Amino acid sequence: MDVVSTDVNNVLPDEIMETGISLVDDDSIEAITISSPMVDEAPMETELERIVEVSSSGECVSTAVVKEAVASTSNNAGHLAVVSVASKPESGPSAAAMKTVLQTHFHKLATPISGQVVLNKVSQASDLTAGSHVVKQEGQKLIVTTLGKSSHPIVLTLPQSHIGNAQTPVTHVQRIESKVTPQQIKLVTIGGNRSDGNPVLGMSALTSAQIISPSTKSPVLQTQQIKTLQIAKKAPTSSGPVITKLIIAKPLNSKPLTEQTTQIASSFAGGPALSQTNPGTPPKALNIADIGVIGTPSAKTTNKIAISPLKSPSKGVKSSVGGINTPQFKTIIPLAAAPNVQQIQVPGSKFHYVRLVTASTASNTTPSSQIQSTSTQPLQQAKPVVVNATPVRMSVPIIPAQTVKQVVPKPLNAASQIVTTSQPQQRLLMPATPLAQIQPSLTNLPAGTVLASAPGTGNVGYAVLPAQYVTQLQQSSYVSIASNAGLSGTTAAQNQPRGPLNGIISSESASRPRKPCNCTKSLCLKLYCDCFANGEFCNNCNCTNCYNNLEHENERQKAIKACLDRNPEAFKPKIGKGKEGESDRRHSKGCNCKRSGCLKNYCECYEAKIMCSSICKCIGCKNFEESPERKTLMHLADAAEVRVQQQTAAKTKLSSQISDLLTRPAPPMNSGGGKLPFTFVTKEVAEATCECLLAQAEQAEKQLKSKAATERMILEEFGRCLMRVINSAGKAKTDPCPMSC
């Protein structure tokens, strides 16, 4: 297949090479006619998604395009003068020209160079001068119409062997005699922009005897059938790519095709109608099916037209040769850089993550980030990541299905580094699982522990908590994080064991949980809040407008930072442990209370449930052993805790009883399969029972019984009446109970 040389591509104007033409309502249709001798039909190959292809042999086919008159943004009007160069001069009268009404403002080109075809747009049809090239019947004929907006002439370069020297004025279609050998003309119709962005391309076979003018008719046409193909486009159009480049091949041989079929495949946005009519026959409507690219089945391939868009502003198209397609995915390889730490922003997460980025030093290491491709490989064996030995305690949640690997940290001189080996796909990660999947079973992990997920997990990446946070487990699913003063400091979470209720249980007060806080105006973000001071989240507390929870993690971290700015040792334990053998704790430093009497929670001694000592610098202290105020407050605190426990137990018992009542099976509604006893207590039965009771009362009165004896006799009679009703219900299920008193 011969491809048009690069000189032709260079001569083509910019409008042809442009694909991003913005047209608002442009329904213009482009038609390109290519003719070659001794060929009845030529298949067409294109890269477009939809093709309209109509072919016929030996029949006169005329293509009419119906479109609405819409306003275009280009506002160009005028005519297009089509000229071509014949392969050789011929004495027989044969020429063709096509006049298309376009819009104005076109530039004309000077005299064409040898081997070129110049297409100029003129203002009116009368401007077709006598200098137009003559199209001979044995040559190739190219008719180009409606190429969108175009203000420059179109220059086509043909081989020198096909260029003739004869130039005859052509203003109309000349008469074609029947003795001339008919030519095969391919009419390629390229639709303009449509709403779906896919142009329509159609091709039909014509002969030179089938192109006539309105004034002259050929006798040959009187015996031939005429087929009319109409394509209506009324749907609103949008901007899209247009045909930019044509690669036209010469016919390999002049043998006619053995099979000739007509295949139509198109899809218009507005549902156009495609009709094919013959003179003397009723019109037939053909529905247009939305199918893929099809071509004319033929035994031999002679002509091929490959159409490919070029210079697309949004994407680059690479041609495929021999059926080899380019891959549909791209791999992004990170640049080689020193090991560093990058902060990861996870949407919707309250925690801060740090990703350890590897340097691409090894040649066989796998990039840490790739775009998802069609083939994915599971993770290989997870290799350890060595980090610096900073005093950090991490409690990391994992899913039970994953494997946990503990890595002993080693001291390094640099910051966080990663040890890479020769095995590919080495990664360590902490899975970002939701809070509902956090398991409180990793409280005894050493400082600096790094967890690796099982191979085959989805999101792969490093997630390491910063050093200024220490995680704590609260109840069963919450994670409490307390800020650290620095890398060398320790927190209360490392020195005090934690319990399930309210987060913390101190070693001395292990018999009871910490009392709930009662903060009202501090938002639980002050140091005198027990929960906040001990690095806990509030749970089962009596506080109002609490911000010491996961929902307000940002405000909580700001408060922690403010406290650390004022006092770097704010979250350190205020009361240290005593020596071995001593039961009482000692002060790390004394309190400095002045007006609270050391009976408030912001007093270190009172908060730790110990008395003030000589180290304290408090004024008006009441926190000593014989202080009645201290005893009263302690008793009140104990009573409050007991009351809370009792209320919790009562609520739990009540809820369990309610659940038992709801789940208890209902008693059977039928007694022996019949009516229930109370259904027999009708109005008549009630009246008869009352009469029996009155009769029993009269009998007791005649016997001069006492009041108590009379009441006893009446109650006994009432019991006998009820037993009769019950017995009657058991015997007669449908009949009413007859009672005789």
Swiss-Prot record:
Binding locations of Zn(2+) 4: C591, C593, C598, C603
Keyword Zinc: yes
Keyword Protease part of the UniProt annotation: no
Location of the CRC domain: 513-626
Residues engaged in binding Zn(2+) 3: C524, C538, C543, C546
Site positions per UniProt: Critical for interaction with target DNA: Y528, Y602
GO CC, any one term: nucleus
Annotated positions binding Zn(2+) 1: C517, C519, C524, C529
Binding site for Zn(2+) 2: C517, C531, C538, C541
Binding site for Zn(2+) 6: C598, C612, C618, C621
Compartments where located: Nucleus
Keywords noted in UniProt: Activator, Cell cycle, DNA-binding, Metal-binding, Nucleus, Repressor, Transcription, Transcription regulation, Zinc
MF annotations from Gene Ontology: DNA binding; metal ion binding
InterPro entries: CRC, Lin-54_fam, Tesmin/TSO1-like_CXC
Positions with a binding annotation for Zn(2+) 5: C591, C605, C612, C616
Record-annotated site: Interaction with DNA: R566
Region (DNA-binding): 515-528, 591-604
Annotated region (Linker), positions in chain: 575-588
Subunit structure: Component of the DREAM complex.
Function recorded in the entry: Component of the DREAM complex, a multiprotein complex that can both act as a transcription activator or repressor depending on the context. Specifically recognizes the consensus motif 5'-TTYRAA-3' in target DNA.
Sequence similarity: Belongs to the lin-54 family.
PANTHER family assigned: PROTEIN LIN-54 HOMOLOG (PTHR12446:SF36), TESMIN/TSO1-RELATED (PTHR12446)
Description of its domains: The CRC domain mediates DNA-binding. It contains two CXC subdomains (joined by a flexible linker) which are both required for efficient association with target DNA. Each CXC subdomain coordinates three Zn(2+) ions.
Protein name: Protein lin-54 homolog
Gene that this sequence comes from: lin54
